[in-house]
Regions:
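Conserved phosphate-donor/acceptor-positioning beta-strand/loop module used by diverse small-molecule
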Residues: 17-42
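Short, solvent-exposed loop/turn segments at secondary-structure junctions
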Residues: 8-11, 32-35, 43, 87-91
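Hydrophobic/aromatic-lined pockets within catalytic cores
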Residues: 12, 22, 105
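Short N-terminal helix/helix-N-cap motif within the alpha/beta-hydrolase-1
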Residues: 12-15, 38, 94
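Glycine-rich phosphate-binding loop used to anchor ATP phosphates in small-molecule kinases
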Residues: 1-18
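Structured core elements
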Residues: 3-5, 25-30, 83-86
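PAPS-dependent sulfotransferases, especially Golgi type II membrane carbohydrate sulfotransferases
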Residues: 1-2, 40-83, 91-160
Length: 160
C-alpha cells in the first residue's frame, strides 16, 4: 500500500512514522534553501503553528532546525530516507522518477510523466501546480525579490 502526504512539517514526525510503520520509506524532496523559504514566505497558511513563516529571520532559523533534524533522521534511519533533489527532478524527470520508483519497489508507468492529467481531487496549497506539467525555473523565482529578501538570504548563507 502506498500513502503519500506532502505537508511541509512532516519532517518532524519521521521517527514516529518509521516506528509505527517500520516498512515505510520516506521521500525527502530537497530544494534550494532560498527557493524553499520563498515558497513558504509568500504563502498564507490558515492553520496555526506556522507563524515562523511570516518573518524572514524566524523562517531562516526554522529552516536551519529542519536541516539539523533531517541530518539526525538520516543518522538514525540511513536506509529509510530517500533524498530527491527538486532541481534534478525538474531537469531529468524520467530518470529521477525511475530511480525513485526503484527505491520504492514500484513498477515504472509512463503515466508517471503525465501526473498533471490525473483528474482526482487534490486538496493542497499547490493544487494548481498539480495540474501543470513539471517545469524548470521555479527554484529561481525568489531572485525577483532578492533585494527584499536580504534578511532571509543572509541568515540562510551557511546552507544556501
Amino acid at each position: 500500500k502506498v500513502i503519500t502526504d506532502k505537508m511541509p512539517l512532516n519532517f518532524r514526525y519521521i521517527g514516529f512514522i518509521l516506528s509505527a510503520f517500520p516498512e515505510a520509506k520516506i521521500i525527502h524532496l530537497k530544494r534550494d534553501a532560498r527557493a524553499t523559504c520563498w515558497s513558504i514566505y509568500k504563502h498564507y497558511f490558515s492553520s496555526k503553528g506556522n507563524g515562523f513563516s511570516y518573518d524572514q529571520n524566524d523562517l531562516a532559523a526554522f529552516y536551519h532546525l529542519y536541516t539539523e533534524l533531517m541530518t539526525f533522521w538520516h543518522q538514525q534511519f540511513p536506509d529509510k530516507i530517500y533524498d530527491l533533489c527538486y532541481e534534478d527532478l525538474t531537469t531529468n524527470q524520467e530518470e529521477e522518477t525511475r530511480q525513485l520508483l526503484d527505491y520504492c519497489n514500484l513498477d515504472w508507468d509512463k503515466n508517471c510523466l503525465n501526473f498533471h492529467t490525473n483528474k482526482r481531487a487534490v486538496k493542497t496549497a499547490s493544487a494548481l501546480q498539480v495540474r501543470q506539467k513539471m517545469y524548470q525555473g521555479s527554484s529561481e523565482a525568489w531572485r525577483q525579490y532578492e533585494d527584499h529578501l536580504q534578511p532571509l538570504i543572509n541568515a540562510l548563507k551557511p546552507v544556501s
